[in-house]
Amino acid sequence: MTRLIDEITLFLESEGFECSRQMRDGAEVICTRTLDGRHSRIILPLEISAASATQAAEVSDRAYECVEFIRTLEDAPLIITEDRWRAQESMMRARLLAHLELFSQAFARNCEVRRIEKAEARDFLTRNHSYGYAACRYHYGLFLKRQTGHLAASLENKESLAPGTLIAVATFSNARKWSKGDRVIKSYEWTRYASLPDLRVSGGMGKMLKTFINDVRPDDIMSYADLEWSRGDVYSRLGFVLEGQKEPVLFSVDPRTWERTPVKPGTTAGDGGPVIPGSAGNLFFRNFGSNKYRMKLTDYE
């Protein structure tokens, strides 16, 4: 099988990007520039080869050290994990190009938010979110009324999207309730948000969040930013406050399908190898954890 770094390099070169392979803190990375040539970007491919939980933890710790090393000297690298690249290749290619400023654009003011059915949300998120669909209570879709942003001359999106196209989905959990004095606080989790991978929706997250708040009147909303992708700066811009971190999650990865399955705490043997049904021959990957954000809409302690 072709090495991950070779595949990504060949893909970018086929799209017209000049690439060089360099070393950063002991890791081989891809160096390129955004489409307009104004910004350099570093891509850190992470192959998945760990045969045990212990090895996966060591690889994760080393990769995180490399990410932090790069961040102190340059911009944060784009992290591409092997399972994502191979299992969701079309989405990952489009998302990578979008990070390099090759994307189409839409503005939230030219869109409308509507409640959608679970099946429609599931289908969209399965195709366009790295973790797919997760059980939730509220499903919202962002539908294009007209497109006035620029268009990317790459991949499938070479023409304007038709009015009425579903371009983003946001989902929220049911309420978690607790008592504060004589009040009942209702807290919700913003479970998923994804747009079409080669489309940047300016103001999309904010518009969908505002609709949910107006519909449901929550006291509190929390969400997680997966550190594989970002630190969650967009949440801060929306008014959320960083509250803490969620510990890294260990996954069992099927090398035939590249599907991730979380390994539940307490299911590992003494040597660190997960003891779970169907894990024989699987590889293991531990992510970097998540940043936890919260928006308080009601004043409570």
Spans of features found by a protein language model:
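Catalytic cores of nucleic-acid endonucleases
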Residues: 55-86
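Acidic-basic catalytic patches of nuclease active cores, encompassing PD-(D/E)XK
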Residues: 1-22
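Short hydrophobic/aromatic beta-strand or adjacent loop that forms the aromatic wall/cage
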Residues: 27-28, 137-139, 288-293
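Active-site/acyl-donor-binding loops of N-acyltransferases
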Residues: 224-300
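Short, high-confidence coil segments that cap the C-terminus of an alpha-helix
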Residues: 72-75, 217-221
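Amphipathic, interaction-prone secondary-structure segments
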Residues: 22-37
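Short beta-strand-loop-alpha-helix junction that forms the active-site gateway
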Residues: 35-63, 175-177
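A conserved beta-strand-loop-helix scaffold within acyl/acetyltransferase catalytic domains
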Residues: 91, 95, 100-219, 225-233, ...
